[in-house]
Curated annotation (Swiss-Prot):
Name assigned to this protein: Probable Fe(2+)-trafficking protein
Function noted in UniProt: Could be a mediator in iron transactions between iron acquisition and iron-requiring processes, such as synthesis and/or repair of Fe-S clusters in biosynthetic enzymes.
Entry-linked SUPFAM superfamilies: YggX-like (SSF111148)
Keyword tags: Iron
Molecular function per GO: iron ion binding
Similarity comment: family membership: Belongs to the Fe(2+)-trafficking protein family.
Origin superkingdom: Bacteria
Amino acid sequence: MTRMIHCIKLDKEAEGLDFPPYPGELGKRIYETVSKEAWAAWLKHQTMLVNENRLNLADVRARKYLATQMEKHFFGDGADAAQGYVPPTY
């Protein structure tokens, strides 16, 4: 049976995550309040941040930066925009 939650990011009832996606209290909080749809959107944004900012995930500072951005994305004022990213024009 699908676990339904009220997604804090999308402000609607949606399918919850299958397991906490991150360790610790932040992971538990995300698991309890973020939907699969919102998590997928974060993963796309996170990929843009890594690529555009040329982050090295072996660097502790880069991982801390992403954790901070993730918390801001879901529970704060929103994550940073990817520097240098220009959306395609059609």
